[in-house]
From Swiss-Prot:
Coiled coil, from the record: none
Purpose of the protein: Has an important function as a repair enzyme for proteins that have been inactivated by oxidation. Catalyzes the reversible oxidation-reduction of methionine sulfoxide in proteins to methionine.
Active site residues per record: C10
EC number(s) reported in the record: 1.8.4.11
GO terms for biological process, alphabetical: protein modification process
One Pfam family recorded for the sequence: PMSR
Gene3D superfamilies: Peptide methionine sulphoxide reductase MsrA (3.30.1060.10)
GO molecular function: L-methionine:thioredoxin-disulfide S-oxidoreductase activity; peptide-methionine (S)-S-oxide reductase activity
Protein name, as recorded: Peptide methionine sulfoxide reductase MsrA
The organism's taxonomic lineage, starting at the top: Bacteria, Bacillati, Bacillota, Bacilli, Lactobacillales
EC class (word): oxidoreductase
Top-level taxon: Bacteria
Catalysed reaction, written as an equation: L-methionyl-[protein] + [thioredoxin]-disulfide + H2O = L-methionyl-(S)-S-oxide-[protein] + [thioredoxin]-dithiol; [thioredoxin]-disulfide + L-methionine + H2O = L-methionine (S)-S-oxide + [thioredoxin]-dithiol
Keyword Oxidoreductase: yes
Length: 169
């Protein structure tokens, strides 16, 4: 089994696309990249911890390749926005691919270069690629949010889905 960590704005919106793929064993919402151990949602939202909202994915590389996860990640984000994603603004929502191995780093960097060269976007691809840091699990009410609160999830993800439809379909 391997581990992947992606930050792409609100973690509620990052779970379902990965969870629906064959070879995914778990997708958990949490916080990473900051300086405060075991932060709470309120602390991360206060923008003083340095953490981003992210998802940790445990996957079987025999069933789904890391490269495919990176491609799926791009299609969930606006890779030209370094200051958050969609209606969620600030460092705690910035887009980051966290790599856990040098091979993941190489794959992510090549994928980013390919996306930039594709001309899909008029602006530079600004998503950062950074070494993984400790991942702190978010509170239970955040886990599987799209299943627990489908109406609220639909409302909170509407702007994201419109962008994805216009730019990734």
């Amino acid at each position: 089994m391997e581990r992947a960590i992606f930050a792409g704005g609100c973690f509620w919106c990052m779970v379902q696309p990965f969870e629906e793929q064959a070879g995914i064993l778990s997708v958990r919402s949490g916080y990473t990249g900051g300086h405060l151990p075991n932060p709470s949602y309120e602390q991360v939202c206060a923008k003083t911890t340095g953490h981003t909202e992210a998802v940790e994915i445990i996957f079987d590389p025999k069933q789904i390749a890391y490269k495919d996860l990176v491609e799926l990640y791009w299609a969930q984000t606006d890779p030209t926005d370094a200051f958050g994603q969609f209606e969620d603004r600030g460092d705690n929502y910035r887009p980051v691919i966290y790599y856990t191995t040098e091979r993941q780093k190489e794959i992510a960097e090549q994928s980013k270069a390919n996306l930039q060269a594709s001309g899909r976007f008029d602006q530079p691809i600004v998503t950062t690629i950074e070494p993984a840091e400790p991942f702190y699990l978010a509170e239970d009410y955040h886990q599987g949010f799209y299943k627990k609160n489908p109406k609220r999830y639909a409302q909170s993800s509407a702007i994201r889905h419109q962008f994805l439809e216009e730019n990734w379909s």
